[in-house]
């Protein structure tokens, strides 16, 4: 019991400087509701623990704060966010796959597939395969850099694939299965134009090429592979049911001619499989046991089941989930982002205004936060609309405990404190969770934000942990004590001229001004600019540059 109470005493004291009996009692009772009957006894223990903690040396208090760090609490919370069990899953026998098209870097939307499939592989001690579905060198043309970007971001999110497959390097395998289907009479070469075949498809009639002999079909197929035909002249179709209630399932295209150099395999091939064909073959060959994908791909399963039926294969257990719409990003496609980068609207794929994982990494998001965010959404079939504020909340739980605090004065206004009796070294919290401190010089020439100056000019304000002044360009010193200033109401942050350096924040929220010199030691880390936002310090050369993380 005492151990539990001391944990909350330490956490509360670390956060607020002094432990509150009421706050600690609330935490203890929430964790152990059965103790409500013994509230008086528990309160006495709380008082005792607070007294004991306050009597400890600063060094011992720091050690206790580390011991009871709320990072472990955040990890426990993440562990409780479990996915529902997979139908028909057995430990050690589950094989999951994440199959992106590498036509750009992974986005926040990609993270959902990476995380959910990766978590199920971990949950069942199974196998996790990353397969690049990169067999469209034109419409969804792969970016050569994106292959590596995907692998980097997958590792950053905490997953190590057991196998990495590049579909474009396995095209002869798909040719072999296409030939088998032709020989079985289940696929045919079709010379109809798109418009002509649409008429047959919509009316449910067979096109004239459907019943050409296997021998003639094989001859056309070989000529396709040799490059004898032009793009759009002929395709290979899978025979399904031309009377199927869904026209999209009727004799779908399995291979088409694309005379375009591929970033990975060059000009080696001119006939490429469609995603539905390639994916169907690979899922079988790789032994995929479960597929989790968007409900917009239900037709893909219906098409692919024809191939599985023809070969006598068992289709993987499939679960379709609803779309996730994130309000703040709207409909940003990879192709539109690429155009905007080329036009100079964005500086690159890691521009902090973009929804790419590279951008979120640059902003200082923790992978555990992204993981927690998506696990909380689950894998239901209903569409979900969600705000980035939910992700911010998850990230804040983690970074708030690690981020050092500094002052950033955006739109600085210079102030001279009149009648300041002496320079004073001011001690401020560096990290309230660890009890560490930082120091600033309390001197006559300081800076405050333009916002604060215009809002509070002519009023008595408290310069945080320093002194009280009557705010003006020539600010009258009003004492060092907190008395006379409404608690929290007119407390503003400030910077001494001697410890201010140029700084700016870039990204979703941009600002320029002056930054506390102490912040240069945190390059590469997320900090909290008090009363502004969490930001990741990116560089500190001629000026300090920080990337906006979130409020």
Swiss-Prot record:
Q: In which compartments does the protein localize?
A: Cytoplasm
Keyword Ligase part of the UniProt annotation: yes
A GO biological process held by the record: amide biosynthetic process
Catalysed reaction equations from the record: tRNA(Glu) + L-glutamate + ATP = L-glutamyl-tRNA(Glu) + AMP + diphosphate
- Which EC main class describes this enzyme? ligase
| This enzyme's EC code(s) | 6.1.1.17
Where along the sequence does the record place the motif called 'HIGH' region? 100-110
| Domain of life of the source | Archaea
Q: Entry's InterPro entries? A: Gln/Glu-tRNA_Ligase (IPR050132), Glu-tRNA-synth_arc/euk (IPR004526), Glu/Gln-tRNA-synth (IPR000924), Glu/Gln-tRNA-synth_Ib_cat-dom (IPR020058), Glu/Gln-tRNA-synth_Ib_codon-bd (IPR020059), Rbsml_bL25/Gln-tRNA_synth_N (IPR020056), Ribosomal_bL25/Gln-tRNA_synth (IPR011035), Rossmann-like_a/b/a_fold (IPR014729)
Predominant localisation class: cytoplasm
Question: GO molecular function, one example?
Answer: glutamate-tRNA ligase activity
The entry's function note states: Catalyzes the attachment of glutamate to tRNA(Glu) in a two-step reaction: glutamate is first activated by ATP to form Glu-AMP and then transferred to the acceptor end of tRNA(Glu).
Q: Which NCBIfam families match?
A: gltX_arch (TIGR00463), PRK04156.1 (NF003169)
Q: What is this protein called?
A: Glutamate--tRNA ligase
- This chain's source organism reads Archaeoglobus fulgidus (strain ATCC 49558 / DSM 4304 / JCM 9628 / NBRC 100126 / VC-16)
């Amino acid at each position: 019991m005492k151990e539990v109470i001391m944990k909350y005493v330490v956490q509360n004291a670390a956060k607020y400087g002094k432990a509150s009996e009421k706050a600690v009692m609330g935490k203890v009772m929430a964790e152990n509701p059965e103790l409500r009957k013994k509230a008086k006894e528990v309160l006495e223990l709380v008082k005792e623990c607070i007294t004991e903690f306050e009597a400890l040396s600063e060094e011992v208090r720091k050690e206790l704060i580390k011991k009871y760090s709320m990072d472990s609490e955040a990890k426990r919370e993440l562990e409780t966010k479990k996915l529902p069990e997979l139908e028909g899953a057995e430990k050690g026998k589950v094989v999951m796959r994440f199959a992106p098209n590498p036509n750009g870097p992974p986005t926040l939307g990609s993270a959902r597939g990476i995380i959910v499939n990766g978590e199920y592989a971990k949950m069942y001690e199974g196998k996790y395969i990353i397969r690049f579905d990169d067999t469209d060198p034109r419409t969804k043309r792969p970016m050569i850099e994106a292959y590596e970007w995907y692998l980097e971001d997958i590792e950053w999110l905490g997953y190590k694939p057991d196998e990495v497959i590049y579909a474009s390097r396995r095209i002869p395998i798909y040719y072999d299965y296409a030939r088998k289907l032709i020989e079985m009479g289940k696929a045919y070469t079709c010379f109809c134009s798109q418009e002509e075949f649409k008429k047959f498809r919509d009316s449910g009639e067979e096109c004239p090429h459907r019943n050409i002999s296997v021998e003639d079909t094989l001859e056309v197929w070989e000529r396709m592979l040799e490059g004898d035909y032009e793009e759009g002249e002929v395709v290979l179709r899978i025979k399904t049911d031309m009377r199927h209630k869904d026209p999209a399932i009727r004799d779908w295209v399995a291979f088409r001619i694309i005379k375009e150099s591929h970033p990975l395999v060059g000009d080696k091939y001119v006939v490429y499989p469609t995603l539905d064909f390639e994916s169907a073959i690979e899922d079988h060959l790789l032994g995929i046991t479960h597929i989790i994908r968007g409900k917009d791909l239900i037709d893909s399963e219906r098409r692919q089941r024809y191939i599985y039926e023809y070969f006598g294969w068992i289709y993987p257990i499939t679960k379709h989930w609803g779309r996730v719409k994130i309000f703040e990003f709207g409909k940003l496609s990879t192709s539109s982002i690429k155009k905007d980068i080329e036009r100079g609207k964005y500086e690159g794929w890691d521009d902090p205004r973009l929804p790419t994982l590279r951008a979120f990494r640059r902003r200082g998001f923790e992978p555990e936060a992204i993981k927690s965010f998506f696990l909380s959404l689950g894998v239901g079939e209903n569409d979900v609309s969600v705000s980035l504020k939910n992700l911010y909340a998850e990230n804040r739980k983690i970074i708030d405990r690690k981020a050092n605090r500094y002052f950033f004065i955006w739109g600085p206004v210079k102030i001279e404190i009149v009648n300041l009796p002496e320079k004073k070294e001011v001690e401020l919290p560096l990290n309230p969770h660890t009890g560490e401190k930082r120091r600033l010089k309390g001197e006559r020439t300081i800076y405050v934000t333009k916002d604060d100056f215009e809002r509070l000019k002519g009023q008595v304000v408290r310069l945080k942990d320093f002194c009280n002044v009557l705010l003006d360009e020539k600010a009258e010193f009003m004492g060092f004590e907190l008395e006379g200033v409404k608690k929290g109401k007119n407390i503003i942050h400030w910077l001494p001229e001697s410890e201010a350096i140029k700084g700016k924040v870039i990204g979703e929220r941009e600002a320029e001004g002056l930054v506390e010199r102490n912040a240069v030691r945190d390059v590469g880390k997320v900090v909290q600019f008090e009363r502004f936002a969490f930001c990741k310090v990116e560089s500190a050369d001629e000026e300090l540059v920080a990337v906006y993380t979130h409020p």
